[in-house]
Amino acid sequence: AYADAEALLINNDFDGAIEEFKKISGYKDADERALEAYYQKADSLQSAGNDKAAAIAFGQSDGYKDSRERSITLWNTIAEHPTLAAGRRHTVGIRSDGTVAAVGGNNDGQCETSAFSDIIAVAAGNFHTVGLRADGTVVSCGKTTNKQCDVSSWENIVSIAASGNHTVGLKIDGTVLATGSNVCGQLNVSSWSDIVAISSNISHTVGLTASGKVVAVGSNNDEQLQVSVWENIIAIAAGTRHTVGLKADGTVVAVGNNADGQCDVSDWTDIVAIAAGTNFTVGLKSDGTVIATSVPK
């Protein structure tokens, strides 16, 4: 089995080699050779220009050689790092020195960010604030009723999302962590893999894979999770009861509640970025103009 695994690696069948080495974990240096296979796979993917998949593969190399450094370098070019975020009644922003300013409602301590440092991204839930540090750890403050602030043990995080009463973190290896309220199943992300972007709202969580597919968990009362047929997606956004995806060709797809026309995006073109709110969707066009679905007064 060991010889078979080595032969697969020599022939650049990286996935096959990884699988075979894992089958004989503990034998000789099989575990280290599996990491070498991950590393060579990542190097090959990066050489081919597939930076998203390469970032994940380097992350799966578990610190082997310079894999963590190479993964972080790639993630810094592909991961979203919002410097501003708004919760239900508060707003937070990253200062140039990596500290965080916050204003607004503070009944639950969601604005008590004075201890935050080395922050590269922020996210805000209804009554809590989350910060991603440059070293991949996460800090938080605010309401803890649903354990939405239980992130102190998280590490190797490259992107964060927060909404309602839950918090989501994307790891360097493309897996996802989540904590907080799970009343609708919005935390059920443990089986996700190859994720390159995350988005969440009150009752659902969405993930974008390196292959351009989309996964979603949580409430499906308005069919906001019906994203399995989407392809060639490069960005995602979760509204309160709808989900939006930006395609590689600049068009946009949306599913979920459409009572206010928030999913009426089929005629949008030349879009380079998207956002979703309670009952509306916004798109940034390549010429710098902004388009939005109508919201009744």
Task: Describe every region a protein language model picked out.
Residues 90-93, 102, 128-131, 140, ...:
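Conserved core positions of repeat-based scaffolds
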Residues 81-93:
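Beta-strand-rich domains and repeat architectures in extracellular enzymes and scaffolds
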Residues 1-9, 32-46:
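Alpha-helical tetratricopeptide repeat
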Residues 89, 104-115, 127, 142-153, ...:
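Short glycine/serine- and acidic-residue-enriched loop/turn motifs that recur at repeat junctions
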